[in-house]
Swiss-Prot record:
Entry keyword annotation includes Transcription regulation: no
Pfam families, sorted: CemA
Highest rank taxon of the organism: Eukaryota
Name of this protein: Potassium/proton antiporter CemA
Listed GO CC annotations: chloroplast inner membrane
Family listed: Belongs to the CemA family.
Primary location class: plastid
Length: 229
């Protein structure tokens, strides 16, 4: 009975790890049809907002200019002019489909992540006791480690997260989060986050070493600086 109670927090931790993935999988399947139908019905009333309409018209004008250039070079007869109009029509439909798919994808992923966050927050709130036991286990495990292993682990973690080679990893991670939420890839925003986020983490970490580790374990700080140097 004691062993069973001891493993409850561990299973609770596993459920927290895998719960968002299960929620995302279920919500994607259940919400996709509903969001697609809702978006297609809504599109009958309003097609584009001002920004989307401007972007769409720019692409359409570029396409039309290419067709007109091709027409001037080849000196299209009347039959080919009909093909030109048909090509414009097909490309317009294709632009609309791409636009609709992008918006459906964005709404679906944002809704799924929002639902996952709400459910996971409630799940964590109702399991405070299990989280408290799990936190005690982690603290006991870390306390039993030697200062050398602690310093090595801290140094390894900081080099992975805020080392000179970390920007590529942050770029992949932030890009994955953008994709998971269904947002478009914006190079300027991505570059700004990659260049500032590791610096903020580095500052927080140094402050933590100065305020917490110096008070709790001065020997660990000495070993950390010795390894780092």
């Amino acid at each position: 009975m004691a062993k069973k109670k001891a493993f409850i927090p561990f299973f609770y931790f596993l459920s927290i790890v895998f719960l968002p993935w299960l929620i995302s999988l279920c919500c994607n399947k259940s919400l996709k049809t509903w969001i697609t139908n809702w978006w297609n019905t809504r599109q009958c009333e309003t097609f584009l907002n001002d920004i989307q309409e401007k972007s769409f018209l720019e692409k359409f004008i570029q396409l039309e200019e290419l067709f007109q250039l091709d027409e001037m070079i080849k000196e299209y007869p009347e039959t080919n002019l009909q093909q030109f109009r048909l090509g414009i029509h097909k490309e317009t439909i294709q632009f609309i489909k791409i636009h609709n798919e992008y918006n459906i994808h964005t709404i679906l992923h944002f809704s799924t992540n929002l639902i996952s966050f709400v459910i996971l927050s409630g799940y964590s709130f109702w399991g405070k006791e299990k989280l408290f036991i799990l936190n005690s286990w982690v603290q006991e495990f870390l306390y039993n480690l030697s200062d050398t292993i602690k310093a090595f682990s801290i140094l390894l973690l900081t080099d992975l997260c805020i080392g000179f080679h970390s920007p590529h990893g942050w770029e992949l991670m932030i890009g994955y989060i953008y994709k998971d939420f269904g947002f478009a890839h914006y190079e300027q925003i991505l570059s700004g986050l990659v260049s500032t986020f590791p610096v903020i983490l580095d500052t927080i970490f140094k402050y933590w070493i100065f305020r917490y580790l110096n008070r709790v374990s001065p020997s660990l700080v000495v070993i950390y600086h010795a390894i780092n140097d």
